Amino acid sequence: MVPALRNAKFARLGCMHRNTFIESPKFLDATLRLRPELDCAKDIPPTWFAGQITGSEGYTEAVATGWYAAWNMAQTILHGHSDPLPEESCIGSLMNRLVEENEDFQPMNFNFGLLPHHEGLKKKNKKEILAERAERAVREWIAARNMA
């Protein structure tokens, strides 16, 4: 016990956790770039965001946003345009969630509910079908860019 807390009364034990994040839907475009039309972006070079500050939550998601921002930055510098991932992919669906309009934006991990759903998927194998569709979308995206 911490001596200074010896007389403290605890209503509930727990932990404190705080996320620092921006309102990504308001400030970032589909590539996690600061929207150039915003006043705060007028006098600075193009700026991309990644990690927890975007409202993604989790280590894997932090890596995904870092890769995604770097990929789109490179595409913009080298080719003059960005190259987002398909919405059917896990990373693409998370990125869409980070930048789509949302009045009560809060950090989120990836989950299968972010992927586009189609009628008729049975609960029994729904995640498996969505995962296969996500993998296929990424493979097609890679093949279309001759990166395989």
What does each model-found stretch correspond to?
Residues 53, 72-148:
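Glycine- and aromatic-enriched mobile tails/lids
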Residues 61-76:
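An active-site-proximal "capping" alpha-helix that borders the catalytic cofactor pocket
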